[in-house]
Regions:
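Membrane-embedded alpha-helical segments of multi-pass membrane proteins
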Residues: 2, 30-38, 110, 114
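Membrane-interfacial, low-structure loops and terminal tails that flank and connect transmembrane helices
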Residues: 130-133
Length: 133
């Protein structure tokens, strides 16, 4: 929602770091951060085109970006201490990682929609009010 993309990136990284201070840092967090930064960049470029209908599509695309990158990180580095799953470092191992992660995608997409629609509604309401003053 910031006009400056660097401020968007900074806000995202600071919020994630604060959260990770409480939750704990983890080995493949670079993939989570990278996916969120990419999603921020993509949506920064298209933010003027967001409406109620397109948000569903953008939410799906953002969830898919997160799914692909974060699960690649799980395949590449494993998930030590969480599930202790080590995938074979070949195409079959990567495919197995993505297949086993499919049940989590639904929750990612659903939570994206649950939070995105109110956030966009509030943002649009505030920008309409401030522009009418």
């Amino acid at each position: 929602f910031f006009k400056n993309i660097n401020l968007s990136f900074l806000t995202l990284v600071v919020a994630m770091l604060i959260g990770d201070l409480f939750i704990g840092f983890y080995e493949n967090m670079i993939f989570v951060y990278a996916s969120l930064l990419l999603i921020t960049f993509v949506f920064y470029k298209i933010s003027k085109k967001i409406n109620f209908k397109s948000l569903f599509i953008y939410g799906f695309v953002g969830s898919l970006i997160f799914f692909i990158i974060s699960n690649f990180g799980v395949w590449a580095l494993g998930s030590p201490g969480v599930y202790d799953i080590a995938y074979d470092k070949n195409f079959n191992g990567l495919l197995q990682c993505y297949i086993l992660a499919i049940p989590f995608f639904g929750n990612t997409f659903l939570s994206t929609l649950i939070f995105a629609y109110p956030a966009i509604f509030i943002y649009k309401s505030l920008t309409v009010r401030s522009s009418s003053r």
